[in-house]
Amino acid sequence: MAGGAREVLTLQLGHFAGFVGAHWWNQQDAALGRATDSKEPPGELCPDVLYRTGRTLHGQETYTPRLILMDLKGSLSSLKEEGGLYRDKQLDAAIAWQGKLTTHKEELYPKNPYLQDFLSAEGVLSSDGVWRVKSIPNGKGSSPLPTATTPKPLIPTEASIRVWSDFLRVHLHPRSICMIQKYNHDGEAGRLEAFGQGESVLKEPKYQEELEDRLHFYVEECDYLQGFQILCDLHDGFSGVGAKAAELLQDEYSGRGIITWGLLPGPYHRGEAQRNIYRLLNTAFGLVHLTAHSSLVCPLSLGGSLGLRPEPPVSFPYLHYDATLPFHCSAILATALDTVTVPYRLCSSPVSMVHLADMLSFCGKKVVTAGAIIPFPLAPGQSLPDSLMQFGGATPWTPLSACGEPSGTRCFAQSVVLRGIDRACHTSQLTPGTPPPSALHACTTGEEILAQYLQQQQPGVMSSSHLLLTPCRVAPPYPHLFSSCSPPGMVLDGSPKGAAVESIPVFGALCSSSSLHQTLEALARDLTKLDLRRWASFMDAGVEHDDVAELLQELQSLAQCYQGGDSLVD
């Protein structure tokens, strides 16, 4: 890679992971498209960390995610498994057989109207099989900003979104998509429901070799591979796929960082007994096995609990979302993910994945929690110290790891990112001679303000902080969730007027927290209450009773890591 980027290879495992990933890649794509805008801050994030350059058979330059994704049969909708950039119609039409032919033509799945609109604006696949790009001469970045003659882009509606590929606006490399054909996405039969089923998938030579081949393809072209980020469904059989994938990565690429994001969709209901028990077992097995093979593991969910007792989903002061819609939940989680992963994607002075994990995971604490303020509430005329002082002494961010409210818990170490605040708002603009209303108002730089605020909130705790000018992109197809924000994401009184919100400031954090002690112990308690004889179907998928006993022991040992007062400064 040019420029010495510290490359990261992303693995997306599961359908909800596909939803989060689609929003994540759309946000990366939107940021690429703004890189040449004179109003934008200079490049703070290095896209080459996540993307790779390539060429089609016809010499067209491409810039595609360094990505391997796995999903089930029936989950792609109109998206082709080989992608759209590299397809050659002339090769497709070349037939060596000279005898009589019988043609069987499969009916194409209708393309989502939003994607039709997006593709027609971007370019066309001509009759000679060459992708003719209308507005992207070198493959990097998106279309330029709309002009007066540019038709307004179509915005996808919630009703039009059935699967994640319905709103993915990024072209993928042919080596990205790996379909598990033996299980179905739709229907009640043939589902990938249990951890043991997922483990078995990557024990099969067919799928293991396919994953290894794709890994080697991407890894061998890297100059400095810093590691892997895994987006993995925890609630279904993909927890087993993720566990085996992490084990494979640890065995083959020792010394590289492996950061796993365990994803769980919106709220669940007490009446769905089998689904809830399976979710509990999959989550517990997934957390324990992923922790064993990853540098760091972070559950991500808008739910209030990982256990059997349903808790209401989290709420945000300036967001209105439907927790039953994966399209909404995944957008919020992708925004948090885009923020907390900033340290290992920086252009200058990046923190490697390994160093980030080492800082947060001391004394065996390899599971961390995430939290975010989306959007960060900066009103017109306010400075950063003004906004931070409004939080008082409370932990400011909304919890995103289904571990309950962070108030009253202990933080052992944290990595914090605040992005999207204009430099003019970083410090307080007091009239000369006016005494500063707080110690934060007396600071001379935004970085100093953020560091001092974190020290006030968590005295003596190891904190790493980053302050970026670059906001988080929330242009369509990101859903319209913001209740009182201007287009640049400033918090307003009343409903916004005019243009939709395009970008927002976000305050995100990863924390090694004592809340995990209660969460993991509660998970173990729920498991001890199960009569496993009633769930023979889960056990028949490849899990033994001894495995459950070992799981309970591992969960309790992991929970003990977060008990007591030990920290880096104790």
Swiss-Prot record:
A Pfam short name: Tubulin_3
BP terms from Gene Ontology: mitochondrion distribution; mitochondrion organization; positive regulation of mitochondrial fusion
Residues with the Phosphoserine modification: 495
Entry keyword annotation includes Ligase: no
Tissue: Present in all cell lines tested (at protein level). Widely expressed.
Segments passing through the bilayer: none
Alphabetical list of Gene3D superfamilies matching this protein: Tubulin/FtsZ, GTPase domain (3.40.50.1440)
UniProt keyword terms in alphabetical order: Cytoplasm, Disease variant, Membrane, Mitochondrion, Mitochondrion outer membrane, Phosphoprotein
Segments forming a coiled coil: none
Superkingdom to which the source organism belongs: Eukaryota
Subcellular compartments: Mitochondrion outer membrane; Cytoplasm
Annotated Gene Ontology cellular component terms: cytoplasm; cytosol; mitochondrial outer membrane; mitochondrion
Disorder association: Myopathy, mitochondrial, and ataxia: A neuromuscular disorder characterized by muscle weakness and atrophy, ataxia, poor growth, delayed motor development, dysdiadochokinesia, dysmetria and additional neurologic features. Some patients show skeletal and endocrine anomalies, as well as behavioral psychiatric manifestations. MMYAT transmission pattern is consistent with autosomal dominant inheritance in some families, and autosomal recessive inheritance in others.
Job of this protein: Involved in the regulation of mitochondrial distribution and morphology. Required for mitochondrial fusion and mitochondrial network formation.
Entry similarity comment: Belongs to the misato family.
Protein name: Protein misato homolog 1
Organism: Homo sapiens
Chain's gene name: MSTO1
